[in-house]
């Protein structure tokens, strides 16, 4: 057993990213990204604002189309795995006119309520099932969004800074919850985050994107559960931060977003 593969069922999707490129007009945002992500691995993607990390996640989610390169789930196109993929954003995106359990079961047909309650129980909110979203805190709303993803039994979970707006304590609690559920279910995770300490605390591997390219690919070979504030975690965090801070600090342009309609399967 290694730090990268805790004892759990590995049912995640293996990903291959080959020479991935994305251009918006005259601006090249991604410049030949190459990655291999084994099934069930937890990968954190960090980098300065505008470096291309959110664009990478959007391409994996099918929200934008690459200009060049390949996205594969195993040996098949990643588009074949869309039903097994879920995306969580920084905002929970709950429908305020639907009760919590109905938000979890959004879009489902048949007898889904028992599954929705089970998903809410997994995130500690089964007792709030019949309340309205307005009654929840920000962290609780993100738990509901996570339950909405879990009910579909995803094999690939994409997280676009879902904890960015939470207070420090709630953020740590959500990190621990996501880590526990990942260990239980074995899905592949890609987390985009600005928080390097978060990345090294919960990921198997930290990818640093620099100006649209992979600048650092760092394995986090530490046993779980990890001790926050430990010397070894601090050393890894410093290694990543030193690389980020060694780059020129010019104000970046925001990453473009394609205006074209897409087939979005967010945490729904």
UniProtKB/Swiss-Prot annotation:
EC nos: 7.6.2.14
One GO CC annotation: plasma membrane
Keyword Cell cycle: no
Catalytic activity: ATP + H2O + aliphatic sulfonate-[sulfonate-binding protein]Side 1 = ADP + phosphate + aliphatic sulfonateSide 2 + [sulfonate-binding protein]Side 1
InterPro entries reported in the protein's UniProt record: AAA+_ATPase, ABC_transporter-like_ATP-bd, ABC_transporter-like_CS, ABC_transporter_ATP-bind, P-loop_NTPase
Gene3D superfamilies in alphabetical order: P-loop containing nucleotide triphosphate hydrolases
Organism domain of life: Bacteria
Record localization: Cell inner membrane
Binding site for ATP: 47-54
Entry keyword set: ATP-binding, Cell inner membrane, Cell membrane, Membrane, Nucleotide-binding, Translocase, Transport
Record CDD domains: ABC_NrtD_SsuB_transporters
Membrane topology classification: Peripheral membrane protein
UniProt key word Transferase: no
Enzyme class: translocase
GO molecular function: ATP binding; ATP hydrolysis activity
Location of the ABC transporter domain: 15-236
Family: Belongs to the ABC transporter superfamily. Aliphatic sulfonates importer (TC 3.A.1.17.2) family.
Subunit structure: The complex is composed of two ATP-binding proteins (SsuB), two transmembrane proteins (SsuC) and a solute-binding protein (SsuA).
Role according to the record: Part of the ABC transporter complex SsuABC involved in aliphatic sulfonates import. Responsible for energy coupling to the transport system.
Name assigned to this protein: Aliphatic sulfonates import ATP-binding protein SsuB
Gene: ssuB
């Amino acid at each position: 057993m290694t730090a990268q593969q805790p004892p759990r069922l590995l049912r995640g999707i293996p990903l291959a990213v080959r020479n991935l490129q994305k251009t918006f007009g005259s601006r090249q945002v991604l410049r030949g990204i190459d990655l291999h992500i084994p099934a069930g691995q937890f990968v954190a993607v960090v980098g300065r604002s505008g470096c291309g990390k959110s664009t990478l996640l959007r391409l994996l989610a099918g929200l934008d189309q690459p200009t060049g390169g390949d996205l594969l789930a195993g040996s098949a196109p990643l588009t074949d795995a869309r039903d097994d993929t879920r995306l969580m954003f920084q905002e929970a995106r709950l429908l305020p006119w639907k009760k919590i359990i109905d938000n979890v079961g959004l879009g489902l047909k048949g007898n889904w309520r028992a599954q929705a309650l089970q998903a809410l129980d997994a995130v500690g909110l089964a007792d709030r099932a019949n309340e309205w979203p307005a009654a929840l805190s920000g962290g609780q709303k993100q738990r509901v969004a996570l339950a909405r993803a879990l009910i579909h039994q995803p094999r690939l979970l994409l997280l676009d800074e879902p904890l960015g707006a939470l207070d420090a304590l709630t953020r740590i609690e959500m990190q621990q919850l996501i880590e526990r559920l990942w260990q239980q279910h074995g899905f592949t995770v890609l987390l985009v985050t600005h928080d390097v300490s978060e990345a090294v605390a919960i990921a198997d591997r930290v990818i640093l994107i620099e100006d649209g390219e992979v600048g650092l690919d760092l394995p986090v070979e530490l046993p779980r559960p990890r001790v926050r504030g430990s010397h070894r975690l601090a050393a890894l965090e410093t290694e990543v931060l030193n690389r980020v801070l060694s780059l020129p600090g010019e104000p970046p342009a925001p990453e473009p977003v394609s205006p074209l309609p897409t087939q979005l399967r967010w945490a729904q």
